[in-house]
Amino acid sequence: MAVAAACIAVPMAAAPQAAAAGTPTLTISMTGSPVGPAKLASVGCGQTAVATVKMADGTPVSHGSVEFTSHLPGISGNVVGTVPVTNGTASIPWVPGVAGQHIISAIYFDDASDLRPASGQTMITAMNLNGVCV
C-alpha cells in the first residue's frame, strides 16, 4: 500500500528587520579663559566642556545624554556630570583643581535609541597662577 504525502505551503511573514544602529561621531572642545590652540587653563578658573554629537552625514543628534569625566594621566578621575544632548551639543562647566595635564572625556549614550555609544577626549594643561584667571 502506497502512502501519499501532501505538502501544504504556508506563507510565513518575516519579522521586520530592526533598523541598523548608527554610530555618531563625538568631538570635544573647551571654552573659557584662556583656552585656545595651546589648550591652557588656569587652576581654579571656570571652563566649559562642549561635546558635539553628529551623524556621519553631519546631522546633529537631538536626543540622548553625554557623561563627562576628568582625570590626570595615570590617575583615576571623577565624573564631572551627565547632561542631555540638545541640537547636537552637550556642555558642562569644569574647573581644574590642580596643575597638570587633564584628560576630559565624554561618552554619548541613549538607551531608547538605535544609535550606538560614541566617545571622545581632549587634553587641557592647567597652570597654577595663584588664582589669577586670564
Predicted segments with their positions:
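Solvent-exposed beta-strand/loop surfaces, strongest in extracytoplasmic domains of secreted
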Residues: 1-134
